[in-house]
Amino acid sequence: QEQVCAGICESVTLSRFENGKQTPSRNRINAILQRLGLPDDRYYALVTPEELEIEALKKEIVSCNALKCVEDGFDKISQLEKIVKPDDQITQQFILRSKVLLGGLDKRYSNDERIQMLVQAIRMTIPNFQLDKIEDFLFTLDEMKLVNQIGNAYSLSGDNEKAADIFYRLLQYIRRHLPETVTSNRMLPLVLYNFARSLDLSQKYEEGAKVARCGKEACIKYGHYQVLHSCLEIEAECDFFLGKKEESVERY
């Protein structure tokens, strides 16, 4: 119970939610369901005008990141910082994670700074988080994204061995805790691709090709095609270095 509600609410508050004595906010119930490995899109909840404003700004920030509109994104973050409550750790975590993503586009943070900021963000809701014990915790979708970002930050710094270990541990967590949930379906292909890429960059071509194939299969199985071409590219490159040139040409 402590792991489920850590950084989200107190244990006694969770009990009140369970007994119907208190109604949770939408972002809190989403986070709790995600940590339990349950779908977060099968219920209805009333939201306040403040919650609607926060959600709208979060969507705009995500859009700015996708469109690489860095300055607009930081302007939206400033607006969000003015209305979010200090004890809303979930939104505070989103803000810090978004700063790292947007800041990565214009290189305003070094790799070390990015790693420090990402670890700080995840410890807002998981105070005892350790990279070598990833499988010991329960994660929300945003927390899984943070772990994924930390792995990418290590890869960008050139430490692909460390990155591969992070992706491996996150992959084990997803497979064990979230076998068929929507949350898992969204994360699985992405983590498999990043894991395969780190193995490829570590010159572990046989393992990299195998993981890339798993990523390709996950994309097709769950209908998430954003990294399908990237998985094919990694598989092709690994095949090339393994001397399988005909297979490599076919993948490309």
Feature-to-residue mapping (PLM):
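Residue-level signature for tetratricopeptide repeat
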Residues: K59, S63-C64, S98-L105, A153-L156, ...
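Short alpha-helical DNA-recognition segment
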Residues: Q1-R16
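"A position-specific structural signal for the A-helix of alpha-solenoid helical repeats
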Residues: E55, K59-V62, T91-L102, D142, ...
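Structural motif corresponding to the intra-repeat A-B loop/turn of tetratricopeptide repeats
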Residues: L67, D106-R108, S157, F195, ...
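DNA major-groove recognition helix of helix-turn-helix/homeodomain DNA-binding modules
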Residues: N27-R42
